[in-house]
């Protein structure tokens, strides 16, 4: 029986050393730099106040000087002063800091248990975003009660929904609705502008002759010149538009010319002049203004003398048909020609 006491002490010390993250315990606490835990065990001195509990009773992290926090305003500094966690993870039911300082004094702090947070039955306060998330954040499962669970057919998965979670997202819903309305208005305005632009282009590209005539739309009459037209009313035919004499003349003037008129317009100015008068042979003999003719020998004869000599030779040959080539008949006019038309150079 006396052997059971040391055996149980040995087993308990072995199990205790296995549970701790640092199991390098030693019974020699007289080594300089070592730290003795509250249970009598010793750890290296460098493990004291390092933010991680190395002793089983966490005595190595107690009464440690709090280092100056370097965390931002929206973060929570752990007790060690080394680690920082998100502010809403404070008192959420989970030890987010390595030393568990984020879950200490949760019920005593009135700011942590304000109306903006969820109050658990056990006194803890958690952020409302952790309600009905499928995890026991309150440690008494009070945050997971009264949640509507729905099972989709064939999926095999349970989806947990909560009205409290939907309450905190109204701005997202309003933003989606507003964006949809603005998008529809922009599309409608763009379609209206495009339709107006296309209609304007179609009106600008109408032929000119169609714009010059009145447009009849059912019983409405649109006239370009209302002050220069005649409108007659008939019971059977309705409104009849009658053009004035000025418009008829304008239409006649604007018609293209015929083929014969076009040819007459293209004739030169001298085409319609009368022909020059015809001169007889005797008148041509009396014309002395013709330029003289110079022969190869150097003697100059006028064109009128040449014509007269040729005419005399023809008459002589007609008077003497029997001797057409005699030198007697031809010498007389040849001798007489130079006497009449010879000019000195």
Swiss-Prot record:
Region Disordered: start-end pairs: 270-345
Tissue expression notes: Expressed in the cerebral cortex and hippocampus.
Keyword terms, alphabetized: Cell membrane, Disulfide bond, Glycoprotein, Lipoprotein, Membrane, Receptor, Repeat, Signal, Transmembrane, Transmembrane helix
Protein name, per record: Low-density lipoprotein receptor class A domain-containing protein 3
GO molecular function, one term: amyloid-beta binding
GO biological process: receptor-mediated endocytosis; regulation of protein processing
Species whose genome carries this gene: Mus musculus
Membrane topology (UniProt): Single-pass type I membrane protein
All copies of domain LDL-receptor class A, residue ranges: 28-65, 70-107, 112-148
GO cellular component: membrane; plasma membrane
Record-annotated membrane-spanning stretches: 174-194
InterPro entries documented for this protein: LDL_receptor-like_sf, LDLR, LDLR_class-A_CS, LDrepeatLR_classA_rpt
Cytoplasmic domain ranges by topology: 195-345
Function recorded in the entry: May influence APP processing, resulting in a decrease in sAPP-alpha production and increased amyloidogenic P3 peptide production. May regulate ITCH and NEDD4 E3 ligase activity and degradation.
């Amino acid at each position: 029986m006396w052997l059971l006491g040391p055996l149980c002490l040995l087993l308990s010390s072995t199990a205790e050393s296995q549970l701790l993250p640092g199991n390098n315990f030693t019974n020699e606490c007289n080594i300089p730099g070592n730290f003795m835990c509250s249970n009598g065990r010793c750890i290296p001195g460098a493990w004291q106040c390092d933010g991680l509990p190395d002793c089983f009773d966490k005595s190595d992290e107690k009464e440690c000087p709090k280092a100056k926090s370097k965390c931002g305003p929206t973060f929570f500094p752990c007790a060690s002063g080394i680690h920082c966690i998100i502010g809403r993870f404070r008192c959420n039911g989970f030890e987010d800091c390595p030393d568990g300082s984020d879950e200490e004094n949760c019920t005593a702090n009135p700011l942590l248990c304000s109306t903006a947070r969820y109050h658990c039955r056990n006194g803890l306060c958690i952020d409302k975003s952790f309600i009905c998330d499928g995890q026991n954040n309150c440690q008494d499962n009070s945050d997971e009660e009264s949640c509507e669970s729905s099972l989709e057919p064939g999926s095999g998965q349970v989806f947990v929904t909560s009205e409290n979670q939907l309450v905190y997202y109204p701005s997202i819903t309003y933003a989606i609705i507003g964006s949809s309305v603005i998008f529809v208005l922009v599309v409608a305005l763009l379609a209206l502008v495009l339709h107006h632009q296309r209609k304007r282009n179609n009106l600008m590209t109408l032929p000119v002759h169609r714009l010059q005539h009145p447009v009849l739309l059912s019983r409405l009459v649109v006239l370009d010149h209302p002050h220069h037209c005649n409108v007659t009313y008939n019971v059977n035919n309705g409104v009849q538009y009658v053009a004035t004499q000025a418009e008829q003349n304008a239409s006649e003037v604007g018609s293209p010319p015929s083929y014969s008129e076009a040819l007459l317009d293209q004739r030169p100015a001298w085409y319609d002049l009368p022909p020059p008068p015809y001169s007889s042979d005797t008148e041509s003999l009396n014309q002395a203004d013709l330029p003289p003719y110079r022969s190869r020998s150097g003697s100059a004869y006028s064109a009128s003398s040449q014509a007269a000599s040729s005419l005399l030779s023809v008459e002589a040959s007609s008077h003497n048909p029997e001797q057409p080539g005699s030198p007697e008949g031809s010498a007389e006019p040849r001798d007489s020609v130079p006497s009449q038309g010879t000019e000195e150079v």
